[in-house]
Amino acid sequence: MLGTGDPNLHSSCILSRKKGRQGHHIMKHEQIGSQMTEFSWKDIINALALANMILGLFSIFCSFSRKSYCASWMLLISFLLDIAIGTMTKHLNIPHKLGLELNDFAIFTTFGLASALLLGVDGPLNGFLAIIYVLTTSFRMCFYSTGGATSGYKGLPCPYASCVLASTCLLTKGNTFILCCMASLMILFMIDQSCYPHDEILDSDNWKKIVYIGGVILLFFSPFPLTAFYCLTWSLSYIFSPETLWGRGVRIKP
């Protein structure tokens, strides 16, 4: 007859259905939570990239107002901020097209346009060199975006070249001749296709983290000449000793 059967079997079926529904809800809840966490990290990275671009725009305005001191200070802050953005993006492994485009535009604005304006546009030679610097920055960014380099950068990264110019501007009080010489040297390093290691300072050796934290502390709590000398030494050590100093101890993720 219908409706007859083992009651234990019926109850076990009900329990299995309940467990299945609970498991489905738990999996769905965990999936939503992971998506929200990933979305929040994307927002943080995008906000930092936007802040980087705003600093670059302020640096441009300061250069037009002939306040190279403030313009250089903005670029040094952007240099430290860019390292944090790059480390977070690589460490979290968050592919985000809009975020990448925003960060690329921020890099071009800050470390391309704003850095080139430190040279000044008063004379034809300065203006021509500033244009060459911007074009070199664009070429280097396009080459890296399409080159597919995984073990490191090809050509000197733009933030380090910008850090050298900003530090030199602070130490020389905006000496145009010295800045033009340094900019010419940075252009050669950027178009040279030598390999430079990824600057995952915050995900590497402890001494590299100390170098980064020291830069942050000096930038906000010490006189500018000392900060500029510190950042200049940091950048030049990366330029001239990329593998011996900065290429060791980087954690290779599986």
UniProtKB/Swiss-Prot annotation:
GO terms for cellular component: membrane. It is a multi-pass membrane protein. It comes from Mus musculus. Coiled coil: none annotated. It comes from the Eukaryota. Keywords: Membrane, Transmembrane, Transmembrane helix. The chain crosses the membrane at residues 44-64, 69-89, 113-135, 171-191, 210-230. It is found in: Membrane. This is Transmembrane protein 269.
